[in-house]
Structures are given as C-alpha cells and as structure tokens.
Amino acid sequence: MKLLFSIALIYVSYFAVAQQETVKKDTVNKLQEVVISASRVKESILKSPVDIQVLTAKDIKLTPSLSFFDALENVQGLQVITPSLGFKVFNARGFSNTTNVRFAQLVDGMDVASPHIGGAIGNSLAPNDLDIEKVEILPGMASALYGMNTVNGLVNMITKSPFTSQGLSIQQNTALTHFSDTESDVKLYTETSFRYAKALSSKFAFKINAALTHGYDWIAGDYTDLNPKANSSNGLYGNENPAYDGINSYGNESSNRKTILLGGKNYVIARTGYNEKDLADNTLKNIKADAKLFYKFNEKSMLSYSYRFATLDNIYQRANRFKLEDYFVQQHGLQFENKSITAKVYINNESTGKSYNLRSMGENIDRNFKKDADWYNDFKTGFNTATANGSAIPEALNQARQFADNGRYQPGTAAFNSVLGKLQDINNWDIGAALRVKQSFVQSEAQVDLTEEYFSFLKKSGIRILTGIDNRTYVIMPDGNYFINPKDADQNSNFTYGKTGGFVSVTKKLLEEKLSLNAVLRVDKSDYFDAKLNPRASIVFSPNNRQNFRASIQSGYRFPSIFEAFSNVNSGGVKRVGGLPVMSSGIFENAYLQTSIANFQSAVLNDINNNSLSQTQAIEKNKTLLKKNHYSYLTPEKVKSIEIGYKGLFLQNHLYIDTDFYFSQYKGFIAQTNMNVANTQNEAEIPAYLYDNSKQSKYRMYTNSKSSIKTYGFSLGLTYNFLEGFTAKANTTYSKLENIENKDGLEDGFNTPNWMVNASLSKENLFKNIDATIGYKWQNSYYWQSFLANGNVDSFTNINAQIAYKITTLDTKIK
C-alpha cells in the first residue's frame, strides 16, 4: 500500500481582494451560477442544454486533495488516470488512454494541447491553484461548438481577473511519499506557487503566476511476462522461458527475439533487456509560469495578451514509456472581446529537449555492447558447451545467456552511463533513443452573437443567433525520425496540416421562456478529407426556475492528429507509419496481419519440435494461417450521441440534484495495428519470409477499426447544505460498453470502470477560523488495454481529509 502524507502551507497576502457573497446561508448557490462552456455564451448552469459540471472556488478551497487538478478526480462524470506523478489525463464516457486525443483541455478557452500528440501534457500549461476562478467540465461530446478533439468532452479552466483579484499570493505544498515502497526510500515532494496581480488603472492590469514542483515518481516495476507461451512447445514457462518480455523491462520485446536451432529443436530467444529503474532517473522537476496583460477600451471591450510556458523532467507514457528531460512547451495568446464579439489567436509550440524512449534505450544499450548476430552466435556456443557438459536444457539456456552477456554494461557503472548519454543524443530509434520533436500549431477563431447588438430586434421574439469560425494549422518540422515531409523531394522541409470549421447556433425561447429550443450546425474541413457536418439539436424545459429538464442529440467527427496522420518512426525494428495515403502507400496492400504471423510461426515451431516435420514442410502445412491485411487508409472517426438530463433544487434550495443519461455510437475508431510485409516480390516465397523475422518489414499502422461500438451510462449528483454551513455531496457515474458489432480486435480499450462513487462532507468555520472536509472515492476494477500492456486495474478506495486553519493576523492559512 502506498501512503501520501501532506502538509500544505498557504500564504495569501493582505492585498488579495475578497469577493462578497449575497447568497442566503445554507442554500445551494445554483440559481445565480453562470457557465459559458456549454453554449459558448453565458447562461444559467441549470438551463444548460448539455451536461456541464463546475468546480468552484469554494470547492477548491475546501477540497481535501493536494491541488485543484487532483480535486477534478471527484467531479461527477469525469475519469482521471495518473500515468505518473504530476501527470494526469482527463476523460469522460469511456475509451480513456494516456494521451487522450478525444478530450480537450482549455485555459480561458484556449486549447493547451501538445502539437505533436494532440492532447495536453498533463497539467503542464494549466494554471496553478492560486489563479483558478473555477473549472467548467463538459463530460460528453462538444464537437458541434468546439470541433477540435472534443468527441468525449472538454475541461475549461477559467482564471481570475487582475481587475477584481489583486495582490500577492504564495502557496507551499509539502508532502512525504513512498511509504512502504520496496523500490524507494521515503521521498520529499514540494510544490511552490505564487501569483501577483495588479490593476494599474481602470483600463490596464496584469498578473504573473509561477509554480515549481519537485518530487520522486513511483518506479514502474511490473515484470509480468508478456510472452509467456513463446516456448510452450518445448515445455519452458516462467523463469525458464528464454523469450521473457517483462512489462517494465526493455530490450527483450518481439523485435529483439529470434528463433534459433539448438540441439535439434527450435527455441524462441530474446535478448536480456534492462529494467526501467535502471534506464531513467525518476526525479520529477517541473517549472511552469504565465503572465497576462489586459487593456480595457471601455466597460464592454477588452484586449488581452497571455504567455505561458513549462519545462518538464518527468516520466511520460504512450505506447512506450519516455523520460522527459528539458521538455519545453509554451503558448502565446491574443484575445479581444466585447459584448457581442470574441476573437482570439494563439500559438502552441513544443520542443522535447533531451527526452528519450526507454524501450529504445534498453535495446540499443544491448546492441552497443554486442550486435544481435554476434550475441545469438555466442548464445549458441554457450548452449552447446553447456549441453556437452551434461547440463539439462533449462540450465543450458541459462548458462548460454550468461556466456552471451559476459561483459554486458551494468547499470550504475561509468560505462553504462556513458553509453546511455550517447544514445540519448541519437535521433534514430533503430540505433539510438532520442526524442527530438519540435512542433507548433496556430489557432485562430472568432464568434459573434448576432442578436446582442446587430440584430437586437430578434431578442423580442426570443431568438438568439451565435456564429463562429475557426482554423488550426499545424506547422510540422521533420526531425528525421518522428516525421518526414511526404510531398517534397526534401523530406526534411517543413509542411502544414490544417483544419477550418464554422458553426451557427440558433436558440428560440417559447412559453414565457420556459421552453428553449436550440439547433447548432457545424461544418469542418480538414486537409486530405472531405467536409464533415456536426449537428446538435437540444431542448430545455423549465416549468419554473428550480426545475429543468433537457434532451439533446448530436454527432461529431474527429480528424487524425498529426502523429496519427504523418508519423514515420523507426521504433526498434518496427516502423510506426501514419495512415494517410501520402505516408503509407503500398503498405496496406501488401501486408499480412502480425497476429496471424504470430499464430503461423507458433504452429510451424510446434510442428518442427513435436511432429518431426522439416521447416519447409511445416511452413507449407500452416501457410493458410497467414491473413492478408484488410485495413486501409485513415478516415475521420464518427460519434453519435443522445443525452437526457435533469437539474433541480428542492427543500427551499438546500438540496441540488443533477442527473443525466447518455447513449453513444462510435464508428471508425482511429487505432493502431501491427502488420508485416515480406521482403520479396515472389508470392511463393512469402510464407517462408514471414517465418523468418529478418526477412520481413514490420509496421505499426494507424487505421480505422471496422467495428461499430455502442456505449451508454448515467450519472447522479446530490448536494445538500444544512446546519449552518455544512455541505454534503455525493455523486456516482456508471459507464457501460454495451455492444461491439463487426468486432475486429482493433477497438480502443474501453479502459473505464463501470462504477465511480465520490462523497464528501465539509464545513466552513467548523470552529473559529477552521474549515474541514472529509472525502471518499471508490471505483470498481476494470480491464485496461494498450500497446504497452493489457491487464486488470484493481478496484480502490480513497479517504482524504483536510483541516485548514486561518491565521487572520498574518493573512495565512495552514492546511
């Protein structure tokens, strides 16, 4: 069991401006609560046409979590996974993964995604706790209004204004981690944050924020064998399996295995590999900062410029595990807004610094010590010597490995560190491990509320018209390993990949504004693809201002990210190639599915070892097991969703109820599959070439699943205020993968627990100047699928508590 003990020291200077509350005590403040993310205009949260959740400043103040980012784990309908310390990924309604490209993360309406990944790098560009006004969460499709990568929803983090929240604030979080950790001593975790904001006049203001986080990540130490049956035909399992491939051991994967003839039988042999803890320093050191300037032309018009950046030293997970070192990401943003117009342009840029791929590092340290051909020859020699001396097969295999590994680089030695440093700078994963990516995108968008000023006469008819347009252009800079220019003779020249979209939203109020009808039509056009329509229709019925029923139906598309479209990565003998025709022409047409090749090779091996067939005879017998690839080039994903919901207040506004139900259908999931191409034009030779790993080219291709997938779920949240300031909250979320039609094995993992439950009890001023909260979280076990590993995630229960004491004379709070 891992324990986390924390002490948070929060200092807020006397310059901070307190916000006045005029809500009656002990009532749930929902009648006055306004949100903007659901419809891109200000509206009551009770009358939102789709599910929206809010984490308020009060929620953040009372959370028993370490930060507002951690507190989001308790939001109704939101799933949060933690691939590493300081790295959290949001998702809703299924199909979670560590680089979620279906769920957007915004700060003041600007997407903070990493350009080359298509999703946010954890909370790297998120505000610190001191600058958060509130967080709005859409746990469901938002494509009609936002496009982008929002088929599963979005989080919009809204920061404080320096006109209304001024002064200096400092926060220090300190924790002890790694209790009862056999891989590490107890470690110190610290996070230091500050915010300074000042209005220099009624027109000009600025703010500056920064945070420094330092800690030590938990060591990934799962050594479960991913290839336990490789030598089952020889009766070798467990520790005797010479093709061992541990989850967090790198250099012994499929591309580092070979079938060799030993003593008259064929054995699958893998190189030895290195454990993750030997390849990466798990020290976490993240720095982030932002600044924003504001100029008001008048009370209705304002121009602002923002800049935020982060540098990361952290562990990061995709299909492989990475060590991020000197990773740099930044955003410049310019925004103008008045009563009817909002326009913004922002640029996201990233550089991966000296980051590296842990798998490639492990396998290429091995190859720097000894080339594969030499190592396998030495293995044969060692095996033959051992058997000649009378050793049994398992012992002979062990002695053969020791002989072949003699002189191998040992972790912690100067020689090992030297070769690791050398490979860290080689940007080719066939011979090195460097991750050297520099990518950018430019996003420009504008929206106009036509009825606010230009067609204000429509207001009398209860009509509101909102229209918007946006463009995102990626500037892709080939690095020789991750990306190449597929259309230019110079494959290292920069190129672009863009998408343009626009929407019109019309809302009509009827029955004395008790009934609200809304229709949204969005059109998106991306390079390489035809235009796609994303419509949404919704209805909200409010018999009174405390009871609100809603229903909506919508569809959306997700276009491939630049990595899915244009990647060209040499990854340890397997080339990962983007799914556009300009990248992968000829591969889909000539490839065989790797799963069928594995079955074919296993059957041939069994017939050679157990049925006395020659290799040629065994290949001929089993060649029908080989399956030609039937996947093709990328097309956009499509999702259709129906949602109904209810928000209401009861017991004189003391009780708030929020519930929703949804049903979604997905088609054309963008996913990866492995396929190999035999290195021969002679069709008769293909089976023999596909039995020999050295005579085939291995690919991991981005393509679309042929499955049609249906999911449904619901959530229920309750908030009850009572007894002079007590607040009790509880919510539950149910998510279900209902059916997969035309199942082809290429579906993304659902990777979502069926049940999540959160509850809390809090009290402001439990005693004089003392706030207290206790929180509870439970989720059931679920099955996780990814290219790194598959397996069960155990159910877990968390109980968190906090007591905060305010020292009024020092304007200081100890939590």
Language-model-detected regions and their locations in the chain:
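Conserved C-terminal beta-signal and adjacent last beta-strands/turns
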Residues: 197-203, 209-215, 284, 328-332, ...
